[in-house]
Amino acid sequence: MQTSFLNVPAQAPSRFRCANWSGLAMANVLLPRYAETQTISFTDERIKTRYVEYDSPGGTSGKMRGYLVKPAGDGPFPAVLVIHENRGLNPYIEDVTRRAAVEGFLALAPDELSPIGGYPGNDGDGKVMQKSLDRGKLFTDMLNSARFLKGHELSNGKLGATGFCYGGGVVNNLAVRLGADMDAGVPFYGRAPATGDIAKIQASLMIQYAENDPRVNALREEYQKALEENKKDFVMYTYEGTRHGFHNNSTPRYNEEQAKIAWERTMSFFKKHLS
């Protein structure tokens, strides 16, 4: 079956939604701060966007929904999974997904809240909703999302993953669990995986840290040492003058200069390892 794309606004009602999803996820207007910080419109001629549903056996509900964005053209394209923070698929992450597609990647942003109604329209409620879910099943949903994207008809079979905060930690652990099925990962200020699991990583990693992020950075040296001892292909960057969340241009923690550098490095890294 060939995938068809229909450009739809972020969080718009669409025919791709499950019938039992709540009205909370049906808002078709961006929150003011998100509208002001959007960098790539869903109507941009360089991309095509749609929401997709796919199976997720063993996950929260057995089904998942994600925001799939393809570059213009027929493909196949290298694939990049974009994993949100701990508050669901908000407009910031949807914009990041469109940014990746503009660079030539088939990009998918799963919404971990989709089994219970989807992103509710504000980050505060989204955070409460995500906290209520089983973390093990959430991770299974991300594993299934990665496999869905890698095997998509428009994918070239090469898989990368990037994520932010909670999503950064997921990227690190996807590298452990997927092994050779994941080619590259770029976690932003995410929790490191267990040291004993590092040997399982086969993906190339670019690990991005904020300078002022004590909780996440507490494991950095241990993570670096384990990667070196296991002879993994990786690079780590720390961005001067930044705090946790510095890439998110919809919050006060945004650091425009360093976010630009980090994103350019991310795209270059994926182009190198996923082509």
Residue ranges and their predicted role:
Residues E112, G190, Y239-G241:
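Active-site loop/turn elements of alpha/beta-hydrolase fold enzymes
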Residues F5-P9, P13-C18, F42-T43, Y51-K150, ...:
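Serine-hydrolase catalytic machinery in alpha/beta-hydrolase-like enzymes
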Residues L143-Q202:
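Primarily recognizes the serine-hydrolase "nucleophile elbow" in alpha/beta-hydrolase
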Residues Q224, E228-S275:
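C-terminal catalytic histidine-bearing segment of alpha/beta-hydrolase fold enzymes
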